[in-house]
Amino acid sequence: MIQSRLMLGEGIVEPMLALARCSKQQRIIVAGSNSAQLMFELHRQGYLRVVTTRHSGLPHGQSDVALVDWRGHSIKALETTLDWLVHFLSPTGVLVIWVDPQDRASNRKLCSILETHDLLVEAGTVRERGSAISARRHELNPISRVA
């Protein structure tokens, strides 16, 4: 348990939750090589509606938040993961990805990948050991609201 807390204790959980602006009642799906540890840490903090992609059992479109710990993986490999992960998000869901420190070209590539999945970057944070970015679905044809 201490080992897994050390892996996540590098200050990634709190910034990811802040970017997601999620409540403890929302459904959260976690992905990445440390997804099980991330799920247990979120459970420890009172987020009980958290599942990993491996054990979700949720139909597509049911998750309010997707948290992805992508440290140690390439941005190119993230594209393949997003191909199926975005389908778990609800239409108003938010995706937060934590990546290793990277250069500007890699940041542009990440934004480009998000755009190809119809996600618009909302916010981000840069820390010593990496950065996180949040994105939401892009509505190509917003629905008009009639009062």
Regions picked out by a protein language model, each given a short descriptive name:
Residues 30-35, 52-55, 68-73, 98-102:
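Structural motif
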